[in-house]
Amino acid sequence: MTRRLAVLGSPIAHSKSPQIQLAALSQLGERASFERIEVKDLEEWLPKHGDQFDALSLTMPLKEQAKALADSVDDLVVQTSSANYLLRENDSLRAFNTDVFGLSASAARHTFESVAILGTGASARSAMVAFSDFKPSIWGRDTTKARALEEAYGCQLVALEHALDADLVISTLPGNALLELTGEKYPGLLFDIIYSRPSPGGFAGYIPGIHMLIWQAIGQLRILLTGEDNPLPDEKSLFEVMLNAAELAE
């Protein structure tokens, strides 16, 4: 059986999801096709085309729309109000959030005590859940949204200067905002989840955003191939295969 897969979002031309997931599926002996599809409105697109695909990876601006369109959602979707994966089972759609897994797995080999999150969107909510044990602080340009997250997740709203001094600084900021806001030396580790842009120097260490892309994709492949969040064989080797595919796609 050849599965038909796609990644949806806008803009989508830069997405490396097809390359990394097809490389992993080939390594696992699975057959699939994987498309990039420009979609701005999931509610409009899904009824017309959704039944043609076995699973759909979702990026911005669709993650917040998916929860309301699925027949069932996992606990992480409920906690984050964000879904980045839709799995079709018979005539129903199941929504999942694998961003939480992608975030935590990317940072797993690092040591840190304090965590700060920059941003207030869907990815920031996933980071809140992924690092909830560390009671993360938050900074956002939109103070109203930042205060809403503070109330929803019990985090602490802080000034930018304080956030940048954390052991682990997770940036979910769009565009060049992070470059515009930084420019000094910082004591911690920067985890910039956006992989398609240059990240600022000045931090003591760096977690590339491509690592999150790969680990959240491994989370999606777990669901695609097992129906649940069950680990796949030798995921460390699978990560290396996917990282190589991402580098070749540059």
Where do the language-model regions lie?
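Short acidic low-complexity segments
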Residues: 44-45, 153-166, 182
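Phosphate/diphosphate ligand-binding glycine-rich loop within oxidoreductases
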Residues: 2-110, 197, 202
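Short, charged/polar "capping" segments at the starts of alpha-helices
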Residues: 15, 65-66, 143-149, 176-181, ...
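Short, well-ordered alpha-helix to beta-strand connector turns
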Residues: 53, 83, 112, 133-135, ...
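Active-site capping/gating segments
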Residues: 105-106, 205-245
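ADP-ribose/adenylate-binding Rossmann-like module
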Residues: 79-85, 171-175, 182-213
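Glycine-rich adenosine-cofactor-binding loop
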Residues: 9, 97-100, 107-133, 139-143
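Structural motif
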Residues: 4, 55, 114-116, 168-170, ...
